[in-house]
Regions:
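Flexible mid-to-C-terminal extensions adjoining Fe-S/redox cofactors in radical SAM and related proteins
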Residues: 26, 270, 289-364
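Secreted/processed peptides and extracellular or luminal domains of membrane proteins
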Residues: 45, 49-52, 281, 299, ...
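Short, intrinsically disordered, charge-biased short linear motifs at domain edges
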Residues: 24-34, 257-264, 311-321
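Exposed loop/turn and edge beta-strand positions of beta-sandwich/beta-sheet ligand-binding modules
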Residues: 29, 74, 278, 293, ...
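The −1 position to Zn-ligating cysteines in a subset of zinc-ribbon hairpins
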Residues: 38, 42, 271-274, 287, ...
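Residue-level signal for mature regions of secreted extracellular proteins and peptides
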Residues: 32, 36-39, 268, 286, ...
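Conserved alpha-helical substructure of the radical SAM core
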Residues: 2-132, 343, 364
Length: 364
């Protein structure tokens, strides 16, 4: 048995044990950090729109204090705002790689600021311990639709320029991976069908196209989620288009399980997979608010209390019980992924059902 396989199995066993219960003083191994609130676009599906472009973002020193308080973090998901607008982006990443042992960083971006993004990434990739940095380019459809939806006539063109830059940078450092992310809504099903083919054919460095289902308090309240039958067919199309690049990709085994879980969650209107938000994952917003997930309100603020004063508070314990009792549900991949992967029963269930769906799809 190879050393890398033993390491992965050991990690999986450790995190599966962690998923059972929260103990005081335990750092969530999967942390979502809104690195800023500043954004240059006006996306209609944004769930964070009420909090954008504020003047109370955490300072570098406040991020440093947070990092020094926290323990080991497996994966850091940085969000915003547009994350690469943050001047100290690379320095903040460095805090978490050095102080918290972060090995993987995922960042969604609108791709508008090519030069800034390259500068920040070159800084981040100076880390000798970082194993993977995934840059996720957000695209809503083909150019005309995407530009109109995001309120900027050059947003698609700028994103493609950033993809080209990332492809060049990846040749220098293969730890950099390039994904695209699209929010599925009732109105952009045809757009995504065409977009996924376009990205596969024109962007050979992109290894994965992810579909997320619209959620939360979107800016345009009229936007609705897709009909599930259409969404299932769209996902089958995306999977077929990208199957040549999914083979061997880190995370490719989990992808069909995520899609299965999202559909079952919507179909049943319940927390179909027992959620481990507040145990395996947590959220820190740009203003210092701390929450267990993006569905529930914040539990406290880092400018008034330390992270663990908030994370281990009576209010936090009560919310963990609510989540455990399945009083909420969502289709957020960032929380579904660890909830599936590090619960053996759920992992087996998702693996079997996702495989059955793949067999059914291949037979139609």
């Amino acid at each position: 048995m190879s050393t890398s396989l033993v390491s992965r199995l050991t990690r999986h066993a450790r995190l599966s044990a962690r998923a059972v219960n929260h103990h005081e003083g335990q750092t969530p191994p999967f942390l979502i950090v809104f690195i800023n609130s500043i954004c240059n676009l006006t996306c209609e599906h944004c769930f964070y729109w009420r909090n954008l472009n504020q003047r109370d973002d955490l300072t570098y020193d406040e991020f440093k204090r947070l990092s020094l308080e926290l323990g080991q973090i497996e994966i850091l998901n940085l969000s915003g705002g547009e994350p690469f607008i943050r001047p100290e982006f690379a320095e903040i990443c460095q805090l978490f790689t050095e102080n918290n042992g972060v090995k993987q960083i995922y960042v969604p971006t609108n791709g508008y600021f090519t030069d800034r993004t390259e500068k920040q990434l070159r800084g981040v990739l100076q880390s000798k311990t970082l194993q993977r940095f995934v840059c996720e380019i957000s695209l809503d459809g083909m150019p005309a639709y995407h530009n109109r939806f995001r309120g900027n006539p050059k947003s698609f063109e700028k994103a493609m320029e950033t993809v080209d830059m990332l492809a060049r940078l990846q040749k220098e450092d293969p730890r950099l991976r390039i994904h695209s992310n699209t929010v599925a809504m009732s109105e952009n099903m045809d757009e995504i069908w065409e977009l996924t083919e376009y990205l596969h054919d024109h962007c050979p460095a992109i290894e994965h196209h992810n579909l997320a289902i619209i959620r939360g308090d979107r800016k345009n309240a009229s936007l609705q989620g897709p009909a599930l039958d259409r969404y299932k067919k769209l996902y089958e199309h995306v999977a077929e288009v990208w199957k040549d690049r999914e083979e061997g990709r880190f995370g490719s085994v989990v992808e069909p399980m995520l899609q299965w879980a999202k559909v079952k969650t919507i179909e049943t209107g319940t927390q179909y997979v027992p959620c481990k938000a507040g145990i395996l994952s947590g959220v820190v917003y740009a203003n210092g608010d701390v929450s267990m997930c993006e569905t529930h309100p914040p539990l406290g603020n880092l400018r008034r209390k330390s992270f663990f004063e908030i994370w281990d508070s009576p209010e936090a314990k009560a919310l963990r019980q609510q989540i455990k009792q399945k009083q909420c549900f969502c289709t957020n991949e960032v929380f579904l992924w660890p909830s599936i992967t590090f619960q053996p029963v759920q992992l087996t269930k998702a693996l079997v059902n996702a495989k059955l769906l793949q067999i059914q799809a291949s037979g139609t």
